Amino acid sequence: MGPRGRQSPSATLAPSQGSCFFILFCLRLGASCPQACQCPDHAGAVAVHCSSRGLQEIPRDIPADTVLLKLDANRISRVPNGAFQHLPQLRELDLSHNAIEAIGPAAFSGLAGGLRLLDLSHNRIRRIPKDALGKLSAKIRLSHNPLHCECALQEALWELKLDPDSVDEIACHTSAQEQFVGKPLIQVLDSGASFCSTHRKTTDVAMLVTMFGWFTMVIAYVVYYVRHNQEDARRHLEYLKSLPSAPVSKEPLSPVP
């Protein structure tokens, strides 16, 4: 038997190892949630709530295993490229009630297959970034944005999976065709109207104007060329008239033998 009171090495190390594990666990918890956000437990899924925090940009320290991310009611004005590419498990993304005006073409890269809901309602989006949203399979909310109704918007909508519960609230804030301003976009398109036909007409008019300009230039050149030649011919004729003429002999011509 060993001496009384002497503890085994394992007994000595056990509390120390437990303390280390506890510290690492606490550090893991602290690092798993951005400072300005809350991360409640949702049935084992990681949810990050950053609503109404006065954020002006998207936090960079969001946990990689986040499933639900709420960034609504902040002051975010732009979504840069690759903002969420480190969140492959993200299923719901709420960016509503911000001041978003610009969305990078690769803003949602890495989310094409997994994202189920993207809320961009109540922002300042005027034009739909087709490159950023076209590859997503998620339902997208775009209501209450100052959209400019044009051909590019109409073409982009064909590639988006709009949320059916809010699609009727997407309206034309501005448009080249003033009769559609303030009207629901879906109602306008269902009536048979097309913003692309106006675009094509504008393009045709521009082409006709260009062709007319070239035709006018050609005619002007031809007129200038003809007048220039006429002037040269007139000067040449005057020059010939100014030459002294040879005297005409008045003697009768002798008959030819």
UniProtKB/Swiss-Prot annotation:
Q: Which GO terms describe its cellular component?
A: membrane
Ranges for domain LRRCT = 145-198
Q: Which UniProt keywords apply?
A: Leucine-rich repeat, Membrane, Repeat, Signal, Transmembrane, Transmembrane helix
Location (main, coarse): membrane
Where does this protein have coiled-coil stretches? none
Per the record's keyword annotation, is Nucleotide-binding included, yes or no? no
According to the UniProt entry, where is the signal peptide?
Answer: 1-32
Its domain of life? Eukaryota
Q: How does it sit in the membrane?
A: Single-pass membrane protein
Q: Report any Pfam family annotated for this entry.
A: LRRNT
Q: Which InterPro entries match?
A: Leu-rich_rpt (IPR001611), Leu-rich_rpt_typical-subtyp (IPR003591), LRR_dom_sf (IPR032675), LRR_TM_domain-containing (IPR050541), LRRNT (IPR000372)
Give start and end residues of every LRR repeat: 65-86, 89-110, 114-135
Q: Where in the cell is it found?
A: Membrane
Residues annotated as domain LRRNT:
33-64
Q: Which PROSITE patterns match?
A: LRR (PS51450)
Name the residues that span the membrane: 205-225
Q: Which cysteines are joined by disulfide bonds?
A: none
Which family does the UniProt entry place this protein in? Belongs to the LRRC3 family.
- The protein's name is Leucine-rich repeat-containing protein 3
